[in-house]
């Protein structure tokens, strides 16, 4: 995809994202896949097919995904326990949605250890995954992007911590090593465009900022070109469907659509409730 086409891609997705959110609010969250309108040069037909049709397994490196859902390799015997004692036990975390993913993250952490790995996290919440990376990779730096306003779902379900979410994040990260964390407050679509302007590059990208398909697709598309070849891209909530089957209200269909767009440029590292990829070519 050329530079002009890439710019068209971003502009069109941002415009469609604003339109969709307006319509979602008007119809109280009831959406339809007919609202997808993408530029023809963006392989819109393939994206629509991926969103509307039955999910196909992503393309896989044969040695890496022998079955429908990968079984993570063993982690050091007390890695999770030490993290809970040394970090979670001294922080303020109202929810633990992360430590169950440590076994699938560990092979990627091993690949990054011993170097100054650059990590981008889209969606930080209270900083639990941020803290894990800082704790697990003492030489890594983390750029964490979040509005720190909480999602509509978190507000509706009263899942936000008492006090300022941003202050909770700051305190938790400071306990590990706040000097290696860069906090960027704002909508990820705008913030990641600013990172493009800085010519930033990352070795690991974690996309966990929204459950809306268009948000997920835009976050993935914008961060892909920031990811180094052989770097890792991890999507959270691959199978999440708590609000029903509508493809625009779930991350999974957007992730599958993104995989169609970058077909041939990645291999799957692990697949379960999260999907982890390794970028093989630009």
Each language-model region and where it sits:
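A short alpha-helical cap/connector motif
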Residues: 2-282
